């Protein structure tokens, strides 16, 4: 870690490769040895690392808080991450939206396969400070200002008083209920129910 701090960005890729290739027993030993220091310093990244080590014993993904930005989002806030950017959701409820893709790579904190060579070849090793996006409010719609044209994301908070029209020619719309219930009506009069359980 001292080398990473001293060399900066040029040390990031070799450090990440070293972490990714650590055997599970070495991950456990390293994190166990760091435990007293973590309790003493109480740094957010170290505390998250300790929590992940307990939840995913032997998984090198537990080191992620040392390599990634810890970002805390309030309800309604969002992040936009470009392709090739590693990320993880540590707690809470989130909705992930991405453009059409069949190349999702896992980096850890999972029982699923981690394709380490492909991951190392694909990840963008760069210093990044993610910007928290806050919605633009227009009536019952909260639109997230996403900096790409591939898709858009907005949250609707129906109040029963204001009808809302969505869609346009050639657009695909997905409605996902996070809480409550709403009844959309199509142009032809067909209705259906969308709620948190649907």
Role assignments for model-derived ranges:
Residues 1-55:
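Long, charge-rich alpha-helical interaction segments
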């Amino acid at each position: 870690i001292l080398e990473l701090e001293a060399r900066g960005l040029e040390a990031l890729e070799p450090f990440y490769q070293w972490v990714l290739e650590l055997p599970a027993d070495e991950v456990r030993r390293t994190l166990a040895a760091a435990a007293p220091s973590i309790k003493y310093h109480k740094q957010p990244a170290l505390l998250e690392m300790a929590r992940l080590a307990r939840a995913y014993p032997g998984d090198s993904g537990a080191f992620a808080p040392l390599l990634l930005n810890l970002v805390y989002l309030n309800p309604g806030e969002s992040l936009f991450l470009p392709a090739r950017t590693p990320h993880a959701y540590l707690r809470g409820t989130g909705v992930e939206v991405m453009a059409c893709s069949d190349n999702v790579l896992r980096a850890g904190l999972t029982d699923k396969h981690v394709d380490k060579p492909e991951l190392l070849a694909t990840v963008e090793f760069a210093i990044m400070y993610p910007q928290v996006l806050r919605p633009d409010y227009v009536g019952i719609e909260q639109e997230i200002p996403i900096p790409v044209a591939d898709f858009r994301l907005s949250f609707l908070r129906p109040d029963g008083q204001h009808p809302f029209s969505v869609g346009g020619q050639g657009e695909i719309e997905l409605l996902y209920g996070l809480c409550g219930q709403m009844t959309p009506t199509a142009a032809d009069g067909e209705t259906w129910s969308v709620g948190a359980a649907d």
